[in-house]
């Protein structure tokens, strides 16, 4: 499992380069997804990997670890993620969000036993998740076409190009010991996937086309993220066409 996660960054960049070259371009009804044929192939590949390796591991993770332990793990990674969110809040000139996120980090690190407890939320310090893709969007960079990345899942061309910097800004990747980085990466994958077990099953059972459901949901969420929950009534995806809110 560790080996494919170590290769995920290069695979993601490869997908972005293929998109830039217009690989597998097809005419579709949705202007946001001009590479749907390629994206569906990658989506199916990700489904196979998930069903064979990631989902069973996440189910075992839930079975073995008590709920309070899993909550602590999620809080720990959330605290690490707040550091990069704080940086991007600053890059977006969001002064209050930057200060409050800094306060969250200090409160949870020192009063929450290294982030295992989310004391800051109890103190009503709002958690804001920001990344470099959102920062680019804040400064007017269009999302570009929808892209499904190998192993990493839904993205846009803008977010794919922002991915290397997001990875460099990930505090868990700053540990000098490679074994520690690998353990943290694997644990975070299990933490994220375990939290989606029921959601993914419901989507697959209820949707006639899970690919379309995931795509539309992801793009809507990213649009809301960029505009802090208040997106415009229409949105230009950089191809000359606008999509209604």
Feature names for model-found ranges:
Residues 1-12:
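Bacterial N-terminal signal peptides that target proteins for export
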Residues 19-22:
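C-terminal motif of bacterial Sec signal peptides marking the signal peptidase cleavage site
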Residues 25-27, 134, 139-245:
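A structured, mid-to-C-terminal "fold-capping" secondary-structure block
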Residues 30-60:
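Post-signal peptide N-terminal segment of mature Sec-exported envelope proteins
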Residues 42, 62-73, 89-93, 100, ...:
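N-terminal post-signal-peptidase region of extra-cytosolic proteins
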Residues 51-79:
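N-terminal, post-signal-peptide region of Sec/Tat-exported proteins
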Residues 69-72, 92-99, 121-122, 225-232:
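Surface-exposed patches in mature extracellular/periplasmic domains of secreted proteins
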Residues 79-157:
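Mid-length scaffold segments of soluble, non-membrane domains
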